[in-house]
Amino acid sequence: MTTETGPDSEVKKAQEEAPQQPEAAAAVTTPVTPAGHGHPEANSNEKHPSQQDTRPAEQSLDMEEKDYSEADGLSERTTPSKAQKSPQKIAKKYKSAICRVTLLDASEYECEVEKHGRGQVLFDLVCEHLNLLEKDYFGLTFCDADSQKNWLDPSKEIKKQIRSSPWNFAFTVKFYPPDPAQLTEDITRYYLCLQLRADIITGRLPCSFVTHALLGSYAVQAELGDYDAEEHVGNYVSELRFAPNQTRELEERIMELHKTYRGMTPGEAEIHFLENAKKLSMYGVDLHHAKDSEGIDIMLGVCANGLLIYRDRLRINRFAWPKILKISYKRSNFYIKIRPGEYEQFESTIGFKLPNHRSAKRLWKVCIEHHTFFRLVSPEPPPKGFLVMGSKFRYSGRTQAQTRQASALIDRPAPFFERSSSKRYTMSRSLDGAEFSRPASVSENHDAGPDGDKRDEDGESGGQRSEAEEGEVRTPTKIKELKPEQETTPRHKQEFLDKPEDVLLKHQASINELKRTLKEPNSKLIHRDRDWERERRLPSSPASPSPKGTPEKANERAGLREGSEEKVKPPRPRAPESDTGDEDQDQERDTVFLKDNHLAIERKCSSITVSSTSSLEAEVDFTVIGDYHGSAFEDFSRSLPELDRDKSDSDTEGLLFSRDLNKGAPSQDDESGGIEDSPDRGACSTPDMPQFEPVKTETMTVSSLAIRKKIEPEAVLQTRVSAMDNTQQVDGSASVGREFIATTPSITTETISTTMENSLKSGKGAAAMIPGPQTVATEIRSLSPIIGKDVLTSTYGATAETLSTSTTTHVTKTVKGGFSETRIEKRIIITGDEDVDQDQALALAIKEAKLQHPDMLVTKAVVYRETDPSPEERDKKPQES
């Protein structure tokens, strides 16, 4: 007779071992015995081993699913049938969600992503669909309930970031490369071009009429290819979008430029597009609404070089990354801690008020990401530990340095892709969300101002960008003899003068209009002729030095020859014929660079200016004191008036300036950098002298040119330029020290005095008076903080008298108490045989001043008349003396 003690003892033993060894309990097997009617305990005990067998397997699966209901509540009531379902739960079906991503060409890409997937999974799918390898510059955005743009964090689950039911995203550029030419693949530059075109059309990247036309022409060349007279008939660009307020005039200008780009490949056109777009002031600036400590509405812009502060579309302050010690936010406040300056002992903290807590956190994240991407070699690891002060958020992607290293390893044939149309851009929005409907010339300050500061003000913060650009600046240039036929650009082309100056002057004629202009500092006037002038100095990019990149030079030189051949020229000294070929090549190379650099002008008062006068006889003398940055020479090249620009038939002169400075060391040959248009002097070059910037050529025509340059030990550069009248002969053997100045007696002198001021508080620095007629004053004051810079006072004066106009400009810059005060004083003397219309002259002077300094305020305008003595009185004075 068999007993069941054996099985019972085994079951009891298994029950005792089960709590101590749960894994072993699942492996315990008990023999199957017939149901013992006299032993109910055996039946009850038989259930427990099967229960112990199934529970560990169920719990391990349930832990993966994060579903603890089975393990918690059904310990004693679990049925043996559960053991049959547990193996099937291993093949779990994950829920997926459909994501819709709007690409840069307005097409949509749909894909399925696991609901618990991270943002990096979706981003990789999109980049794989686009065949994009240099993907670190891009990102995905989504809109929250407040319609605010948020960046999708690739390290977090998508479900935890986006709250709305439809998963809609947009593929955009997150980090704008400071030098797009360093991108390896054309497809990456193509998507960057699409992003910039969207920024321009929506108003996030403001630019002038000329820049709209230039960038639009490159976009047309990239999309449509070479101009074909049979295929491209009528207004073939009307369906494309180039500007927020696109006009027929802009489209005609784009078509004119497009016709000159024959032979330029789409890739080259995109490189030219990027080389010009990167110089715009708002390039790569991510704007956020905020208020300052006084409750004034401002915009905080985050870019590659630091944090920018804007008010009324003008940049009022800048904090470079090296000067920022700490970035933080608390509730809806955003704080930055500034490194103490040279004369400061303590750190300072600046706070800004944002609309809400989420906005402050969003801005803080953007700052962290931009600083890490552009400034660090590798990203910082997030802090570890249970208790961590502050946020654990850190940028998790690759930095720019790592991206460039990875891009250098790309080894694949250039991917084929089709460039799509830009017809999708139909909206026009401004920076602050309002309708974007300002004149083209209003954005000139954006075209010139903050961008130059981003590159030049802080060498440490803009190191990565400046290295690439200085590589272009260091291109060796030679100073050759300059002949009138080799001048870079004509003053005007007749076909461009769709709007004559007379139309603009009629609107300025009345005194009431002048008063209203003085009372409205933000009103801007359109001056198309200045735009045409600037546009002919614009670019082809130096990144592609092929002749295709400079399509306008041939037309410009042809127009110059046509204009000069209409007049009867007296004999003048010429250079030897053997040098003309080399001179033409060097002059073209210099001109290419000068045109390209024209967009990089900063709208700020700096230590050196360039005179641009309209005259037959002129003498220009300027002095540079102290050291200055590479782009300082261009700061006022667009800022000095040319009041008789509307007289297209007037003779003008060319001024050629070279910035070859040896700080602290005199030049071995005082005349080594000078040039003189005489047969005895050949081509002069300065190969041994450091070229801070290539030759700056103003667009003028002269019959003869004499230039002398001296470099003095105190780093003082003095250049005197003398232009001869057409009726006067120049002695070919004249030494460099001689000057020829032909003057014409003036009869009536009309003087316009204009004062402009833009400062937070009245400045204390006063401009020294320049010897000459006490007739004028265009006075400009600009107050901006400068940290860690020495006190610098720079003065510039230029006087030119002609039959038409004479302009004197005086600039004094003083740094005091951490603030820079700049005062600009201009005298405009209009001389003529007949009476000058005071209203028209004053209107033109005010308009010119506001166009040149749109960020300044005109506060005073004075007009008075001077009459020269009669010829008899002039004869008596020498006799009496």
UniProtKB/Swiss-Prot annotation:
The gene is EPB41L1. One of its GO terms (cellular component) is plasma membrane. It is found in: Cytoplasm, Cytoskeleton. CDD domains: FERM_B-lobe, FERM_C_4_1_family, FERM_F1_EPB41L1. Residues 76-87 have a biased composition (Polar residues). One of its GO terms (molecular function) is actin binding. The modification Phosphoserine is found at residues 75, 378, 430, 437, 461, 466, 510, 540-541, 544, 546, 564, 578, 639, 648, 650, 667, 672, 678, 685, 722, 784, 870. Residues 1-88, 428-501, 514-596, 642-699 are annotated as: Disordered. May function to confer stability and plasticity to neuronal membrane via multiple interactions, including the spectrin-actin-based cytoskeleton, integral membrane channels and membrane-associated guanylate kinases. This is Band 4.1-like protein 1. The modification Phosphotyrosine is found at residue 343. Residues 17-35 have a biased composition (Low complexity). Residues 97-378 form the FERM domain. Pfam families: 4_1_CTD, FA, FERM_C, FERM_M, FERM_N, SAB. The lineage of its organism: Eukaryota, Metazoa, Chordata, Craniata, Vertebrata.
